[in-house]
Amino acid sequence: MSTIVIFLAALLACSLLAGWLIKVRSRRRQLPWTNAFADAQTRKLTPEERSAVENYLESLTQVLQVPGPTGASAAPISLALNAESNNVMMLTHAITRYGISTDDPNKWRYYLDSVEVHLPPFWEQYINDENTVELIHTDSLPLVISLNGHTLQEYMQETRGYALQPVPSTQASIRGEESEQIELLNIRKETHEEYALSRPRGLREALLIVASFLMFFFCLITPDVFVPWLAGGALLLLGAGLWGLFAPPAKSSLREIHCLRGTPRRWGLFGENDQEQINNISLGIIDLVYPAHWQPYIAQDLGQQTDIDIYLDRHLVRQGRYLSLHDEVKNFPLQHWLRSTIIAAGSLLVLFMLLFWIPLDMPLKFTLSWMKGAQTIEATSVKQLADAGVRVGDTLRISGTGMCNIRTSGTWSAKTNSPFLPFDCSQIIWNDARSLPLPESELVNKATALTEAVNRQLHPKPEDESRVSASLRSAIQKSGMVLLDDFGDIVLKTADLCSAKDDCVRLKNALVNLGNSKDWDALVKRANAGKLDGVNVLLRPVSAESLDNLVATSTAPFITHETARAAQSLNSPAPGGFLIVSDEGSDFVDQPWPSASLYDYPPQEQWNAFQKLAQMLMHTPFNAEGIVTKIFTDANGTQHIGLHPIPDRSGLWRYLSTTLLLLTMLGSAIYNGVQAWRRYQRHRTRMMKIQAYYESCLNPQLITPSESLIE
């Protein structure tokens, strides 16, 4: 519930913000020049100031109706006040003046940056390098109502009917009227090619794109609750980066270019270097700033009437017929190789992080199978599964009766500590062959017989048969001694179990001492000859305990070895069939876990525990479900099928996203790496090609007859 409330609140806030932005933008469209003075302070127009403005506009209208020297009246200028005229904008800025050819008594045009303003002509003498200006809105041009402390209100009180003639002043920050006339042909916006020269190189956008790649990577390793926020942030960063790189510039960001016609002249002294000469060229009152690589080609236009396009900061965009920044960018595009390098490096970083931190085997297999169209297979018999034609990526659901595989040393298993050891129920052997019989061992039977014979004589029970009378046995027990009433049987069972010379050495030595024999062979001969029948041996309790421990220690290796051997003998299934393997080590059987692991039992109990496990797991029901990740057939003809648990919806999206991110990073690294190299090579030769282009245009080489292609 709280998540829905937060989402609705965020949606409402975004809607309000979008509405406010749309309202502000629509208002700025009505006053397009307001953007140029975004940092200006504002105040309200006072009644006295409004009265002075109205009087000035009335007198201006009367003067403009007077015919000029040629008999033509001046073009009407609409400077009527409107609803926005009550807002006064205050700013400090430089004023640029251009002269025009017209009968207008006020033949100058004034600009603040790219915005033309109406400046009362009697204030021209007060223009400085930096001017404190107050403006108000009108229907056409912004009207200056105050300049450097001089106001219309003061002027209208002091002077009436001032002839609107320009007053030359030596205090102005611009050249006087003795300068040559400049004709303003047009005012246009810069082209996209010209804008590209001042546009940033895209390093910030490249870093935003790399940051979005990193956030997409973290979406794969963070909990699901954070994934929507990370993915949303990554999409916003990616969108911002791509928009900054490829979006066309907004109209408001395109600077104005003034198209002028005049005669450029060099005002420098003789002996100046090339850099000083290129900076000392003026067009009338305007000091021109040329691109450095134009220096060899501007001399031919000096002293001649030429069309020149400039920014308000006096930087040239075009001069004459050939020199043009627009044509340079159009014919020889800018090569931003550094941003491609940054994106390629970021893609490689994320690619290496994917390779080392994220398991890619399952996402790739799942994605490929999903693209190929995987099938769902259900089988309850070996024949059904064999006829289904299982492929990697298929969803498999099988059930039946099989055998848990035996884990052997040197073989890999996803489950490191199975409770059914030595059986591994995450691997099921499934075939139609007869079940293997329960394991048997003659050595284990002999070890068990020896252990039981010693236990029966050392720890007799009242109901056990004995070769001595009950009264004698009772008397011996009361004396604290232990009676071995069939010592020969122990010797024979020991000889039967420990047939090798090095087997049970300590036990044999103990029995030799108890039988007062020369060596073990002599003792065995006596037992085989029946000379030990009826021989009773009395033992102290300590000796009896030592004999019991010796028997347990001597029989343990035989039982342990036979248990391992029997387990390995089960690891030889019949040819053919299937081996179903869980990639994550999940058990396919629903059997109760043993109370303890097989190898945690004492050696004398391991064999019985192993037989119980074998009886339960050699023919057990199982259910296996998952996505097929691998299929191969071994030398025995058994088909191995690896299964990965079926992921939930979140897991499926993670698999697809991992593959998509991997392929995207690989493609981005290759593409941007190649682009960075190519752009770097072109960037190195771009200026030489531009100069060669200007040389061919300004100094064309005539083709001699011998070089003509037409014979």
UniProtKB/Swiss-Prot annotation:
User: Could you name the Gene Ontology cellular component terms for this entry?
Assistant: plasma membrane
Pfam families recorded for this chain?
A: IgaA
Mind telling me which residue stretches traverse the membrane in this protein? 2-22, 205-225, 226-246, 340-360, 656-676
Pull the Cytoplasmic topological domain ranges from the record: 23-204, 247-339, 677-711
Q: Which domain of life is it from?
A: Bacteria
Regarding the membrane, this protein is recorded as:
Multi-pass membrane protein
Show the InterPro entries listed in the entry: IgaA (IPR010771)
Which parts of the sequence lie on the Periplasmic side of the lipid bilayer? 1, 361-655
Q: Which UniProt keywords apply?
A: Cell inner membrane, Cell membrane, Membrane, Transmembrane, Transmembrane helix
Location relative to the cell = Cell inner membrane
The family annotation for this protein states: Belongs to the IgaA family.
Put simply, this protein is called Putative membrane protein IgaA homolog
Originating organism: Escherichia coli O157:H7
* Gene name, Swiss-Prot/TrEMBL: yrfF
